[in-house]
Amino acid sequence: LALLAGCKEPPGSSLFPLEEGRRWTYRLSSEWENDTRERETVVLSNLGRDSALESGSAWHRRSDTGLDYWLRADATGIYRVAAKSDVDAEPKPDPTPRFVLKAPIAVGTSWQTTTTTYLMRRNSEFPPEIRHAHPTIPVVWTIEALDDRVEVPAGRFEQCVRVKGLALLRLFADPVNGFKDMPLTTLEWYCPGVGLVKVERREPANSTFLTGGTM
């Protein structure tokens, strides 16, 4: 019994596979409040365990957009420990574990990380993207459901875990409304044996000075 307990997989392992050779292709569709639309494809690949970090081995994942991530999985959940962009010489360790899924995998489990804006823009400033001025915004994640059914171009998936992220960014909306708390909402679906299958992001602005959008 002790041997079997030692071999038990960390919570959430089947919902976010880390083993080498896995590959995901995502179609991203973004739409802004001014009716602008963009389409792109992003590919994520698992490269297996490596020892690039001073803190020890971790699972290496790479995006074709030029971003690398290192993750670990244990009894507390699945979390990122470092990241690297094309302009970084070395991986940058996260100050604290950045959870993707936190144990227990149960409705109500919550945790905090940071996010930024991906869609919201100012209408008359350069650069227009809000993220340049607000690179880190606190976001609270909560597991909302354990048995969602999700249908995407790759197929239909069941028994999926739905996670909601909510952040508030205080911005000057316009002279009439002044400063407003802008909600940044993310929904993510993780499905057994597959991983992340769907993401929805909403950044509404409803302002004459700002343009929001959905992804």
Residue ranges of predicted features:
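Sec-dependent bacterial lipoprotein signal peptides
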Residues: L1-A5
